[in-house]
Amino acid sequence: MTTWNDKHRALTDLRENAAGMSRNKQVLHATALSSQIKQEQVPVVRREMVRALVAFPVVEAESGLEFAITDEDADIRVIACQGWGKRQTDRAFKLLLKTWRSDTEIDVRVAAIQAIGNFDGEQVFAELVKALSDRDPAVQFAGIQGFRKFSGEDWGEDPETWLAWTQGERPEVTYNGRENIVDLLNPANLFR
């Protein structure tokens, strides 16, 4: 009988060694994981399977990741969103967009909008603006993080400042002492 520790160790090894494998081995492992994840009943094991799948850049990993983005466990959906965010494909963008718009768990929506920030285009811009306008501060912050990746700009932590920037303004960034030292020392914030 295989224990949880054995499975965890094997999946961790698989994840850590994926990049060094030949393409054929990556395809073999990604195909097997994509199939196994659909049969696995234990959420923690599925979670580790998804983490391993994310490490495989081959298309064969995508069926397992697509299954994972609709998993009943929100933590698994979050990891799937992060994984899809590393894949710059139309399929990845569409799945993330659907998840951002329809998932009921805030953590999953946050992960989806953060991942959407890795993409380019007008639709990405529009979705990030929607995130900035959301009522939930976690979603607003995810929108800010997405815009930082999308634009390379840094307008602080205030969603209103970012919204002004999206409308073509060069907003004044004022610091009220609640920012962390990293924000204060960011070169983009020192030389405005």
List the predicted regions and their residue ranges.
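Conserved hydrophobic register position within alpha-solenoid helical repeats
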Residues: 10, 49, 80, 112, ...
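Amphipathic alpha-helical scaffolding segments comprising HEAT/armadillo-like alpha-solenoid repeats
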Residues: 1, 20-39, 58-70, 89-102, ...
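Alpha-helical adaptor scaffolds
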Residues: 51, 63-67, 74-114
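HEAT-repeat alpha-solenoid elements in large eukaryotic scaffold proteins
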Residues: 5-15
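Short inter-helical turns and helix N-cap capping residues of alpha-solenoid HEAT/ARM repeat scaffolds
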Residues: 2-3, 41-42, 72-73, 104-105, ...
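Core register positions within helices of long alpha-helical scaffolds
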Residues: 13, 52-55, 83-86, 115-118, ...
